[in-house]
Amino acid sequence: MKGTAWRAALTGVLIRLVARLVTAPRPVWSGVAPVARQRLYFANHSSHGDFVLIWTTLPPRLRARTRPVAGADYWLASPLRRFLIHDVFKGVLVDRQRKPGQPDPLAVLREALDGGDSLILFPEGTRNTDDKGLLPFKPGLYHLARDYPEVELVPVWIDNLNRVLPKGEVVPLPLLCTLNYGEPLARIEGEDKADFLARAKRALQALAPAGASVPSDPVSPDTAPPDTTHPGSTTPGSTTPANSTPGSATEASGPREGAPND
């Protein structure tokens, strides 16, 4: 047991070192700070390396309690992957091929949240390798946000990683990556699933750098995102502040951590 823990710790150090050498990941915290709060980080998904970068760019005290949500079919396919996801990343595995009658796939995520852990989630559900915008969000984000109102919902835009590790490749290319951490998404009382997921998608798209090819969904006056330009304010009908850390815009420089992968 002690030997496994030692190997996992050393492997984690090596992974963070390689990630920094290859991509020099730069976390930018805007409207949110890297503080010890229970959170659900939701991000765009273009590579198996996505959650590794989030995991790498979280400070150690946050990384220790932040677990990526990942596809069991991929991460259980070999002894090495099992070691990485279980012992190094402490991942939460979900069965993406669930058949009728099988347990609720969100049960393991609820168990992790009930235990006080934060999660890294990719609401698109699979890797998105084109430049046509985000895929439709899966409903899991909505259900977890509804059932755990105390957990902050932090969008994270990962820029450039699809060029560092394209789908099907195993050798990364040395390119710089930026991770934009945005302000927590507010809950709006009575908001239905479709409206919530559309608003979460817009919040994530808004973090994409200028010039990125990320088409926005059409927004009508009735579904426009709430005004969160005033720090500390709440939106009409909201039960959670739109910005839990008013006015903060911080670049964190130490290790940090990540979310769901396939």
Question: What do the predicted segments below correspond to?
Answer:
Residues 15-45:
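Helix-to-loop junction immediately C-terminal to a conserved catalytic motif
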Residues 212-261:
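Intrinsically disordered, low-complexity terminal tails and inter-domain linkers enriched
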Residues 129-194:
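A cross-family acyltransferase "interaction/gating" segment
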Residues 92-136:
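Internal catalytic-core helix/loop-beta-alpha segment
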Residues 106-107, 111, 177-200, 205, ...:
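A charged, well-structured terminal subsegment
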Residues 38-40, 118-122, 154:
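Residue-level preference for the first positions of well-ordered beta-strands
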Residues 1-25, 76-89, 169-174:
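Alpha-helical membrane-targeting segments
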Residues 35-97:
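Catalytic core of membrane glycerolipid acyltransferases/transacylases, capturing the structured
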